[in-house]
Amino acid sequence: MKSERIPVKSFSADNGFIGKMQKLVREEVLPYQYNILNDAIPGVEKSHAIENIRLAAEKLRGKDVKPDEFYGMVFQDSDVAKWIEAAAYALAAGEDPELEKAVDETIQLYGASQHEDGYVDSYFTVKCPDKMWTNICDAHELYLSLIHI
């Protein structure tokens, strides 16, 4: 049996369960996640995910960023990348100028954290640049590099 791809815009889920879930994700979940990634929700532990990417971008622009300014998990860049991906799917299904602006700003920041050779990983850029590609088994570098493809 041959399968055929269906373009995202060819599918409409305006009604029913899927439509309700898409609306919930677009209007509630993605903005909430964006605020979590930006440490903008009081009373919730800071993720520092986007701040770490900002620090990496600043370091690459020559700013004196200290290794201990990085906070969080080694793999957090993927949380931001996956948020961008989810938001892109939501935007493919319908316009949302506010979400689009947040995505554009996040992509711009992400791009500013990329080394000239294409390397992107805020943990190693900020915390321990001398350890890049030394522990691909445990440090999520290979995973993060594939997330960006």
Task: Please tell me what each predicted stretch does.
Residues 126-136:
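Asp-box/WD-like beta-propeller blade repeats and closely related beta-sheet repeat scaffolds
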Residues 94-105:
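Aromatic- and glycine-enriched glycan-recognition loops and surfaces
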Residues 147-149:
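Conserved small/polar residues in nucleotide/adenosyl-binding loops
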Residues 1-79, 103-124:
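Low-complexity, Ser/Thr/Pro/Gly-enriched N-terminal "stalk/linker" regions
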